[in-house]
């Protein structure tokens, strides 16, 4: 199911339905997301305003926090057992809002709430592959710290068979942390990353489904609540 307040959403679903796959697609629009959420096992939230040049992710909080809160309230009522992936920026705070809404509704499960940071991983894979002359399919960079600028931390030392100088580590880390800004500035006010984010969201969602279906060894990085001293 696809859902957005925009009336174009059912038309997008029709467009997608013409692609020859086994997936059945329905589109829903309007203020009520309930019809799209009924029976859902996985919900990915990407709704919200996009960055413009000169903005950072935290500038989106005032608008996007309310959007996430509203959607998660509807999830808590309609499909409280669903796994939720939050893509909406700023991820490090919208995930916390989602957690508080779910706690208030009495349905919070930290093992089912994820801040989707896969975009940082695919960017890291691309940049490392370019630098080292490898195929991007050969590289998998674990990235921790969520998705808020300087908190994005690629673990470059954990890539098998690849080594870096201190300068390469510094340059790569900075580029990965600022890759979103690179896209925003290149689009000159026309929005932020959409196509690469779509690929990242699809990868994370499909990994989640594969794991839920019992496949072993499925590993993805995400922004989640831990078990340590600083866990919420």
UniProtKB/Swiss-Prot annotation:
Key words of the record: NAD, Oxidoreductase, Tricarboxylic acid cycle
Alphabetical list of PROSITE patterns matching this protein: MDH
EC number: 1.1.1.37
A Pfam family per the record: Ldh_1_C
Catalytic activity annotation: (S)-malate + NAD(+) = oxaloacetate + NADH + H(+)
InterPro entries reported in the protein's UniProt record: Lactate/malate_DH_C, Lactate/malate_DH_N, Lactate_DH/Glyco_Ohase_4_C, Malate_DH_AS, Malate_DH_type1, NAD(P)-bd_dom_sf
A single GO molecular function term of this UniProt record: L-malate dehydrogenase (NAD+) activity
Catalytic center residues: 147
A cellular component term, taken from the record's GO annotations: cytoplasm
SUPFAM superfamilies associated with the record: LDH C-terminal domain-like, NAD(P)-binding Rossmann-fold domains
Keyword Lipid biosynthesis part of the UniProt annotation: no
UniProt-annotated binding residues for NAD(+): 4, 64, 87-89, 197
Sites where the protein binds substrate: 51, 57, 89, 123
Keyword Oxidoreductase in record: yes
Family: Belongs to the LDH/MDH superfamily. MDH type 1 family.
Function statement: Catalyzes the reversible oxidation of malate to oxaloacetate.
PANTHER family: MALATE AND LACTATE DEHYDROGENASE (PTHR11540), MALATE DEHYDROGENASE, MITOCHONDRIAL (PTHR11540:SF16)
Subunit structure: Homodimer.
Protein name: Malate dehydrogenase
Lineage, top ranks: Bacteria, Pseudomonadati, Pseudomonadota, Gammaproteobacteria, Enterobacterales
Designated gene of the protein: mdh
